[in-house]
Amino acid sequence: MQRARIKLSSTDHKVLDEICRQIKEIAEKTGVDISGPIPLPTKVLRVVTRKSPDGEGSSTFDRWTMKIHKRLIDIDADERALRHIMKIRIPDNVQIEIQFK
């Protein structure tokens, strides 16, 4: 049987965990095999900018960071289960990628 690999990424880990929980419930309800959610390394994006616009004065900096959390789920590619997964309401700040193997 084919397997579907679902990659989820978001800046909010609580929303990401909630979607993973919903996918896990669907898999248990439909009776398909699931492995995951596997937490992947968090990517930290850093931007450091100078506070002073003209370069005069003391050297003070603003530090901005954004963390991108990722989860990986492998699930059997059952048509009924995937239909239920497609109906999950996914917020705008969550990216989802599905690959079939």
From Swiss-Prot:
The keyword Cell cycle does not apply. The keyword Ribonucleoprotein applies. Pfam families: Ribosomal_S10 (PF00338). InterPro entries: Ribosomal_uS10, Ribosomal_uS10_CS, Ribosomal_uS10_dom, Ribosomal_uS10_dom_sf, Ribosomal_uS10_euk/arc. SUPFAM superfamilies: Ribosomal protein S10. One of its GO terms (biological process) is translation. One of its GO terms (cellular component) is cytosolic small ribosomal subunit. Gene3D superfamilies: Ribosomal protein S10 domain. Keywords: Ribonucleoprotein, Ribosomal protein. PANTHER family: 30S RIBOSOMAL PROTEIN S10 FAMILY MEMBER (PTHR11700). Belongs to the universal ribosomal protein uS10 family. NCBIfam families: uS10_euk_arch. This is Small ribosomal subunit protein uS10. It comes from Methanocaldococcus jannaschii (strain ATCC 43067 / DSM 2661 / JAL-1 / JCM 10045 / NBRC 100440).
